[in-house]
Amino acid sequence: VIDMARRLGAMLPPDQMVVLTGACGGYPDALAAGFRSRGGHVVGFSPGSDLDDHIAGGSPVNNCDEMLFGFGGLIERQVALVRRASVVLALGGNVGTLSELCIAVKMRKPMVIVEGFPGIGPRFLGLLDQLDCYPPPRIRSVAAEDAASAVAVFAAAAAEEAG
């Protein structure tokens, strides 16, 4: 599954976007590695106060071209990350991803959930069905098995948001 995230990252068009991540391991790091392998630029939003704090927390540093620090905590980092994003892409994930998706709903950010990754991403779609969100969230779901479609949907959402 990590390889699938790396492949998705390698398919994103580096001349059309910058990838923002929470600068953590797992899917975000793999996607960033794939994106950078094609010359893409990755900005990591660290929950740490500085690089030493980031490394001490066990977070990777190899796949970010820039690292931003000093958000005042994890939740503040999540808000800053989502606020800066044009489109939110979720590959599985855990509590941090859930929080970022909820922030994206409140900020009316377009979201792309890639199904086929273990974690909260696909479950979030079911959760939204149970809620009465107004206005309704701008969310699209694509299957991870069709990486080209996932990338196309994400790139289209980013282009649409850019105007």
Feature locations, PLM:
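Short, solvent-exposed amphipathic alpha-helical segments in soluble enzyme
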Residues: 5-8, 36-37, 105-107, 128-130, ...
